């Protein structure tokens, strides 16, 4: 680190570090006087770092006055010796320094940093304008910069450093993934194209610094973007790069949403950059229109290098804009010799006003690819122009959907035929969709037939059935000409309506000996079956011909259906076709079966396309079986349409068959080509760059100690210094270690620059000659043996004169193997494999040697650094006055700059955080491993957090049984009882099926059965009260429940006995949906008390068990099945007293529920409350009378007393006593009451008296109507099971399901409360007292609850099972 300047006090320097960040390395610091208004000056401190300057106040505490990036500098003026004026984008600063040397030092540092960050660029160019007087000062600075030795730039011309500097300049966050992609992927691919599609997942604003770095980068020459809508800011940055960069050569912005204004601005940018190297422009798919293209055309005429590639397809051009463009192209003398690709397709150019375009094409030029498709331009006019200017180079001519304005009775222009007969380079002619009458077609074919310069021409005449294209007359022209054309290798005549003439046309096509690819699709649509068979027979004869050159046949979209099997059956023994396209024929599974049979024996086919054939899973399976036996087919695209349909009906078999087909294709397809340099570049990009970063880091530390100890005496110190210097030289040379090791001796075995053969190639060539000689001898012997065998079998025929010699002579040509075959096999296949293996071994050895040597260098450097550090520390103890120097030397840990908004450090900064002692071979390998892992994209972090979204979904484990009930919606007359043992073995397969809501309201008679329900079960009697529970709704408090029984450790015997079988069934329900519903559908223990479980993260909390309760529960469980009741949630208001308790209860509920969401309270008006209260009182009187009559009518041997227990919520719960009639709650046996009674008692033990009440209670009110009697309202899923989800519990003949009262929310005991349960029972609230409170009325009840809620903290202990945790206020929504 640089020594502190003498004119900057130490205290001030410490304050400056606090302002700009202590881990930012300060390179230069100078005291300056900043000129302000007038002649007034202020004392400031100028601090320079690697890419930014800071101007701070010269007092303590210091304050940041101004900061600017070196890239913001627009000019530096030094007209006075000690004065420097810096011009930036924001302001101008005039600073006076102590001496002229200080000015030179500041400028020298800025220039050095710019040269290091932007290699290949002069600092004077980046700073734009530097003026110094006298001029010798600037010359000395330039000489200083030129004399500095720069390190090798990083990957892709040091793009990552430039990107970081530009992010600092523009104030954008640094994206590590951009740096990783460029330094790794781009380096490995050795590409010079920066594709914005690679970063399309980032925000548009993050693309700005990536593009801005191209202004200074000397590696990338192409900027491309396709189908990516670019924002205005991104477009502005692209324009800036175009206007300033002389390295950018290709600009591709296809379908980027650009408009006229961008084209005009691009023209301005080109005008601003006279040294532009741009020669390729692709603006296809952007609505530039005539105005935009006209502006660009002016600059096209001035491009210093001319245009090579111009694509303006689909840019809304008219003939006027095209004329303007072609006029400008003609004005540039370089265009005639440089332009090779011109694409104006997709623009409406119909009409005769294209004179400038025709003139441009008529001039001698070098256009190789001309695309005027979909322009409706005049075909004969274009060909006439091409005849004069494009005969030498034009290879690809696309004039599809153009217009041939030929009138019947007039001759075809001779230039049309002459162009095709005179062209020297045409290989592709596309006239599809063009209206061609027989005369132009004949001229075209005869022109090609007369041209002996062309070879391998591809002619596309598809879809020419647009009027009088190829009907009859056209077919006859084809028949008369096609057989003699020798230079057409690919012919597409599909979709031309040739049905009636196809039979004879195929005969003539079979006589052509040059066509290798033939497309006949969409020509069979209107043919009858009797006419189709002869056509297909002729086609079969054509492909079965031994001398047929045909290699590819397309019958796509011909709708041949079963008739296509005629062709398929001929494929089995076919020896010429390598590609067949039978898609779109609807052949079905039978056709697939035939294709499978053909593939089992065919060894020539390499490609089969077979989509849109209505093939099902069975057809795919047949093909998969055939592919197992086929080892030559290599390309068989997945039939997407058929596969999509088959996956809907039979996904398992379809997926299995498709996977098998792909596996067999992979087996057949063997890739031999290997990029030998790709693995080397990847090794160099990741391993070597990371290693060199570590070496550079430790070398800096060693060099600091060398500088500090160089003047010290002592033999030991001097010896260590010399050893360190030798190690530094080795470390510097190690940067080229891997390249030198990898390329050493390359010319000796791989050939020197490809001019001479390598020893391996020479050996293989000599071997090929020897193998060819041996093969020829073997084949001759084989021929002689065959003729001898023929004489033995047919001696009479073979005795004829000269027959033997004639057979041998005729067979010699057929049995010989081309001499180039063996050579190609050995050199191109075996030779490539050998060379690839050698390259792999060479890279492995070079990497191993380089890695071991670098490990030794790192180890030695670390040891040397420790020795020098020890010397320095001992020396520092003897020289305390140099303490400030030691502080500066130690302070080298970089951090995030305060100016930068960078959240993540780069790899270099992370390496700088390592201590020197950690720079070992082990840490190097760990760093390399980290370097190979691509950073997580920020774009994903901005999406939803999947872990957070799933944290509330319960883990799919077997839930403990919950208290649950079942509402029976059917009338008692329709219930058929089953024996209890029989019921346990039955399984309700439709229990998950949603049930229809009842539309008919319950009758009044059913309402009256709330007091006494007969044995046959009248459960619907509880549903008739619409206004039931209104007072509880406004007075009840939300409290915790003490019926938590989810813990398996605290489960009683009755929870395990009846729930085991159901738990086994529930455990088999898996999947994400059942996972969420698992808690709501869990089995609950039998009870008559309606409760809801509110789970807590800390486990279940329940009241202490009672011995008598357990005994009674076991007895009841042994005797019969429990009753099921329906659980009905009652919304309860939150009041000032119980607000916290309600919040805790709901918080526990939200944690336990799968959704964990908030619930809300419905609010009802006071007028409705009063009206419903009056109805409630009248019905209560009726119910009391009915209950009295029913009690009198019961068996006198079973006296009962019905008690209700009022809890804090204001709800009432039936309290069963021994004297209560057995039919009171739908049970005709004492076991039912014995089973239900302890459940209520035990469940309410913490809130009620332990002793049995002696006074009777008032009669029960009508309970709240069930949800089935209300309009169905969508509700959030809750923890409690729904009636539709709860399975039917088995019961005996006398145990019908009974719908009881609404549930009450009860407090869950905490650990502290549970310990004090026994003592709290000394002052219980009796059931008679609770009953008397029930008869007060709403007002007294409300006051009583307020009093109880205000003092319940002292009575009841903890309010929440999770004590100490602040509950959040949540509500219940019904």
Curated annotation (Swiss-Prot):
Residues 961-982, 1040-1374 are annotated as: Disordered. Residues 1191-1204 have a biased composition (Polar residues). Residues 962-1084 are annotated as: Inhibits capping activity of CP. Residues 1245-1263, 1317-1330 have a biased composition (Low complexity). The modification Phosphothreonine is found at residues 920, 1229. Residues 1058-1092 are annotated as: Necessary for localization at the cell membrane. InterPro entries: CARMIL_C, CARMIL_PH, Leu-rich_rpt, LRR_dom_sf, PH-like_dom_sf, PP1-Reg/Actin-Interact_Protein. This is F-actin-uncapping protein LRRC16A.
